[in-house]
């Protein structure tokens, strides 16, 4: 043990000893101050550590709560469970570290302050008392006169006693100083050692805890990397869809209701206004859904659904042109009826078509469930003749020659129409009326999901078919359309799906064929095409269109302009040229497939449109084809004359009837201020005058809320049949009436 104070110097009580005493006392006083400060800091550290520990445990609980949010995700649940257990173990180790730190502070530092320094203070007090007593004895002994022997002897005895007491206390003080000096070194170093060992134990336990998760962390990192890549792809797709939807929204397009095929059949959902059945007849907006062969609605998601039609097979749907509100249709069941209102004409047609398709799907499913049937049970088609009829003025199936079977047989008799256009399943009973192809029920559902701007789906057995539409289907067909939309399939070595392929494969094929148009024959650059005749000088001839073998006597057998001349035309100009006399439906379909605007305006011919061009050619089928593909029945030329004006001027009664059925504006006036009725009266065309006056009467009755009678429908139906089946007779009739 190193001796800081020399005992010999202590006995001598030399100035060196006194100086050493003062120095040691100053050091011990500073030590006491610093130890007390360390204790205070340690107490603050422990308090902060416990706050940190409590906050950390609350933080871990918050992480655990994330696993209970939303639907269970196994990967996230496993990750959070493993990491929260590990974090809790680390926090337990941290609590042990705090306890060890507190114990070390109490055992080493606090003991040193309370016990070691207390003995030092007592020894110091005794030392200085002894020093004062010795000083007083020395002074008294020195002051005793020589003549006072007795007093001198007493003073000497007191001095000896004081010196002995001082020396004993001085030796005790010196010993206490030396002991406290050494104890200070040992206790402080032991305190630091224990503190570091507690820290080492804490971090060692944390390292071991995290090491157990090392492999899992690596695997999770790889999985997260893949998830990030997938998320980036999804984000890119969402951004692209966001841009498309934003452009669509800025373009003023209406949102379409959701239509898809679900496990319980066709599913369509969207908002409709519903008229209450109470005395006030109030209208309320509700969320309607067609699913599981039922029509239901609800106000809020958590509200129970209200069933409007329990079984779609026992109901019919019809338009309500006589209603005070626009865009109304009625669903009529055996026990009640429900008047509904869409937001626009297009949404109205979508909803009506969806209800009809759902009715068809319900009957098809019932027929599959009940098959095979006996000969006496019937086919099951005629039983639903009135259930799916659209009360819009079209021909009902019961009035068609031959009924349902006649339409199916007539359409399927066209070359290639006996099997589905997209998957080749035999006996298709659905059709896309704007494309002119037949489809199986599964492909028809996929076509319906594309939207009516790509494909308008109708049932061959369940929907009403106007005679001109049946004839249009027979003029086009699967072979012609596939020669257009599948022109490069063999060159691209693409495999066409078969009847046994999955829905996903068929859906991918149909999307690539009609939406992406991957298999079309590529046209020259737009820069190289023109709207006039011929082609630019120096440009090589365009390869001819796919060879199409038409039937003799049909529109497909009419001569077409040379392919070299057509190939140099803009798709819109090509559509315009093909719509003229003589019209060519295959070329028109080809132009539309290549992006032709169905309302393309020919500035060189008085801003005429393809529909006006087809009207001039008196082609009922070309006009029907253009209208089915979105042609505007009211778009006028530079003289302010629309298709109805031109049909009236030219005396084409069948076309006038067609345009009136498609909503042509009766009050539209040309640049000379004449409406179609004025023109018809000037040309003395009795048939067209009759049609126009009937249409005006129908409008007036609808404006007054009157239901009207069936005469209007019967007359229009007769003219439609005559225009489709015997157009020459209709032309002769118009000529005879004109000459009377």
Curated annotation (Swiss-Prot):
Chain intervals for the UniProt region annotation (Required for formation of endosomal tubules when overexpressed with PIP5K1C): 1-382
Compartment(s): Recycling endosome membrane
Domain BAR residues, every copy: 1-226
Tissue: Highest level in lung and spleen. Low level in heart, kidney, liver and pancreas.
Activity regulation note: GAP activity stimulated by phosphatidylinositol 4,5-bisphosphate (PIP2) and phosphatidic acid.
Gene Ontology annotations for the cellular component aspect, listed alphabetically: membrane; recycling endosome membrane
Phenotype for residue 724 to D: Enhances interaction with ITGB1
Name of the protein in question: Arf-GAP with coiled-coil, ANK repeat and PH domain-containing protein 1
Lineage of the organism: Eukaryota, Metazoa, Chordata, Craniata, Vertebrata
């Amino acid at each position: 043990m190193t001796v800081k104070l020399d005992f010999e110097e202590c006995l001598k009580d030399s100035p060196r000893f006194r100086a050493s005493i003062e120095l040691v006392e100053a050091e011990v006083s500073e030590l006491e101050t610093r130890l007390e400060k360390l204790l205070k800091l340690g107490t603050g550290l422990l308090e902060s550590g416990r706050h940190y520990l409590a906050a950390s445990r609350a933080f871990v609980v918050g992480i655990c709560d994330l696993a209970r949010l939303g639907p269970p995700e196994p990967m996230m649940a496993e990750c959070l469970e493993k990491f929260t257990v590990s974090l809790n173990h680390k926090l337990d180790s941290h609590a042990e570290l705090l306890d060890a730190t507190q114990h070390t502070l109490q055992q080493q530092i606090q003991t040193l302050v309370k016990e070691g320094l207390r003995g030092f203070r007592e020894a110091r007090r005794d030392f200085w008392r002894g020093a004062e007593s010795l000083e007083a004895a020395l002074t008294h002994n020195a002051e005793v006169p020589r003549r006072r022997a007795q007093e001198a002897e007493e003073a000497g005895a007191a001095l000896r006693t004081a010196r002995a007491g001082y020396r004993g206390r001085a030796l005790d003080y010196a010993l206490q100083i030396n002991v406290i000096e050494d104890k200070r070194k040992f206790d402080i170093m032991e305190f630091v050692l224990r503190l570091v060992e507690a820290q080492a134990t804490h971090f060692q336990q944390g390292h071991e805890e995290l090491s157990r998760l090392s492999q899992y962390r690596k695997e999770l990192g790889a999985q997260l990397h893949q998830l990030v890549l997938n998320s980036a792809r999804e984000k890119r797709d969402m951004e692209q869809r966001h841009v498309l939807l934003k452009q669509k929204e800025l373009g003023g397009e209406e949102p379409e209701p959701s239509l898809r095929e679900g496990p319980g059949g066709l599913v369509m959902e969207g908002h409709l206004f519903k008229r209450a059945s109470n005395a006030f007849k109030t209208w309320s907006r509700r969320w309607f859904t067609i699913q599981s062969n039922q029509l239901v609605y609800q106000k809020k998601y958590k509200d129970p659904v209200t069933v409007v039609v329990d079984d779609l097979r026992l109901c019919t749907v019809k338009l309500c042109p006589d209603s005070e509100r626009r865009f109304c249709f009625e669903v009529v069941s055996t026990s009640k009826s429900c008047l509904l209102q869409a937001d626009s004409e297009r949404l109205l047609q979508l909803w009506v078509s969806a209800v009809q398709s759902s009715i068809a799907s319900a009957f098809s499913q019932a027929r599959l469930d009940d098959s095979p049937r006996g000969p006496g049970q019937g086919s099951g088609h005629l039983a639903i003749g009135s259930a799916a009829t659209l009360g819009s003025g079209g021909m009902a199936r019961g009035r068609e020659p031959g009924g349902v079977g006649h339409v199916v047989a007539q359409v399927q008799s066209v070359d290639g129409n006996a099997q589905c256009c997209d998957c080749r399943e035999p006996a298709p009973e659905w059709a896309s009326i704007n494309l002119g192809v037949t489809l199986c029920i599964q492909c028809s559902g996929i076509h319906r999901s594309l939207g009516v701007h790509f494909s308008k789906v109708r049932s061959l057995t369940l929907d009403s078919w106007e005679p001109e539409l049946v004839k249009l289907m027979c003029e086009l067909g699967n072979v012609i359309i596939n020669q257009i939309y599948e022109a490069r399939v063999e060159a691209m070595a693409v495999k066409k799906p078969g009847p046994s392929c999955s829905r996903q494969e068929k859906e991918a094929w149909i999307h690539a064929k009609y939406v992406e148009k991957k298999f079309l024959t590529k046209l020259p650059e737009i820069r190289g095409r023109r709207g006039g005749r011929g082609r630019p000088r120096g440009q090589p001839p365009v390869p001819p269109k796919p060879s199409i073998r038409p039937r003799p006597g049909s529109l497909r057998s009419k001569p077409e302009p040379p392919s070299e001349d057509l190939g140099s035309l803009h798709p819109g100009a090509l559509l315009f040229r093909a719509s003229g006399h003589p019209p060519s439906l295959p070329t028109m379909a080809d132009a539309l497939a290549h992006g032709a605007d169905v309302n393309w305006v020919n500035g060189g011919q008085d801003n005429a449109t393809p529909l006006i061009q087809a009207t001039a050619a008196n082609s009922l089928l070309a006009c029907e084809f253009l209208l089915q593909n979105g042609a505007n029945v009211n778009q006028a030329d530079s003289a302010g004359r629309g298709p109805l004006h031109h049909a009236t001027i030219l005396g084409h009664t069948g076309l006038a009837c067609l345009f009136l059925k498609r909503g042509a504006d009766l009050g539209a006036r040309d640049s000379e201020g004449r409406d179609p009725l004025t023109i018809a009266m000037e040309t003395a065309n009795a048939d067209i005058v009759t049609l126009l006056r009937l249409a005006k009467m129908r409008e007036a009755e609808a404006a007054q809320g009157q239901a009207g009678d069936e005469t209007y429908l019967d007359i229009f139906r007769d003219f439609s049949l005559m225009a489709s089946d015997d157009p020459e007779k209709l032309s002769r009739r118009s000529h005879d009436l004109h000459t009377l």
